[in-house]
Amino acid sequence: MKRFLLCSFTLILLYPAGIDMYLVGLPRIAADLNASEAQLHIAFSVYLAGMATAMLFAGKIADRSGRKPVAIVGAIVFMMASLLCSQATEGSLFLSGRFLQGVGAGSCYVVAFAILRDTLDERRRAKVLSLLNGITCIVPVLAPVLGHLIMLRFPWQSLFYTMSAMGIIVCLLSLFILRETRPARLAPRDLSRSSHAAESLINRFFLSRLAITTLSVSVILTFVNASPVLLMEVMEFSRGDYAITMALTAGVSMVVSFSTPFALGLFKPRTLMLVSQGLFLTAGVTLSLAHTNTVTLFGLMLICAGFPVGFGVAMSQALGPFSLRAGVASSTLGIAQVCGSSLWIWLAAILGISALNMLIGILIGCSIVSMLLILSVAPNRSISEHEEIHNQSRP
């Protein structure tokens, strides 16, 4: 079991590392490529576009050909794309590398969730996803620090050499440590009609959890996107104060994430999901009424506490009905989360909504819609029939 957890963690880790590690070198990258920082900020959107593109096909391939081949190919693509970014001499080549990085990270991300679905029951899966969420919260804090230390002695290309090395490590783990978890009884070229019917993506429960997780990811990405403007322009924080504040928010997320597995032993998953949305609603109201920086910061901390309480549980429930199509289900969730959150941020920017109101709007909207879905769409008894765990992994 440890091998599956180790491999799943490293597969997921490529996604946040690809976002956060290079940011500290952005000014030097822009100078060397004769591009403005504003032009290179689109690299974030290009990276997410690459992830969404990979998710369109990675899940289905993983269900038909296996988790291991997709993980290996994804890691190789991430590694090669990182090298391409390091050798870029102009902006378009750099953005091409970022897109391919997203393709590699997206493929690995989908496989990681499929592996967890294959090997863990719902309660253990929810606990592990909460722990993984806590660990990945460390990356946005540590990655820029590591990047800064690297750039004290080496050029910005070393940031991408480091990411390439991460891709090599993930590839080696996938090649020699990871065992295939795809159900042995799943035919490689076709699925029976009865299996498709039993595990259809078009069912109320899955769609409700897809909506909840998409809205929750939209909240956290809106927070990340709006935080520089909100903290440094509206609240007039210095860069140092901003860094400290973001480290504190990451710390809150980590503490709550590591506490959630223990809470799952005391409370029902539905209770934790309602608590999560209650914290989002409280945060939205707090931010809308805040007149001081202290109250605003309290509202931001509530966001970082609310997300890890319910996200892992909701993801676990969403994957629960899919014994044979975990890859497709994982892809669908990933695409919805990436595209849904990007669409909200884009629409808010087009409409000229301020950073604070953008955050308040998604907090209140997410909490109300999610609470209604949690209360009105409960897991069906038939879902438990499909909660099959495929521990008999093959080499």
UniProtKB/Swiss-Prot annotation:
Belongs to the major facilitator superfamily. DHA1 family. MdtL (TC 2.A.1.2.22) subfamily. It is found in: Cell inner membrane. The chain crosses the membrane at residues 4-24, 42-62, 69-89, 93-113, 131-151, 158-178, 212-232, 247-267, 271-291, 295-315, 328-350, 355-377. The keyword Ribonucleoprotein does not apply. NCBIfam families: PRK10473.1 (NF007782). CDD domains: MFS_MdfA_MDR_like. It comes from Salmonella arizonae (strain ATCC BAA-731 / CDC346-86 / RSK2980). GO terms for cellular component: plasma membrane. PROSITE patterns: MFS. The keyword Cell membrane applies. This is Multidrug resistance protein MdtL. One of its GO terms (molecular function) is transmembrane transporter activity. Its main location: membrane. InterPro entries: MFS, MFS_dom, MFS_trans_sf, Multidrug-R_MdtL. Gene3D superfamilies: Multidrug resistance protein D (1.20.1720.10). PANTHER family: MAJOR FACILITATOR SUPERFAMILY MULTIDRUG TRANSPORTER MFSC. Keywords: Cell inner membrane, Cell membrane, Membrane, Transmembrane, Transmembrane helix, Transport.
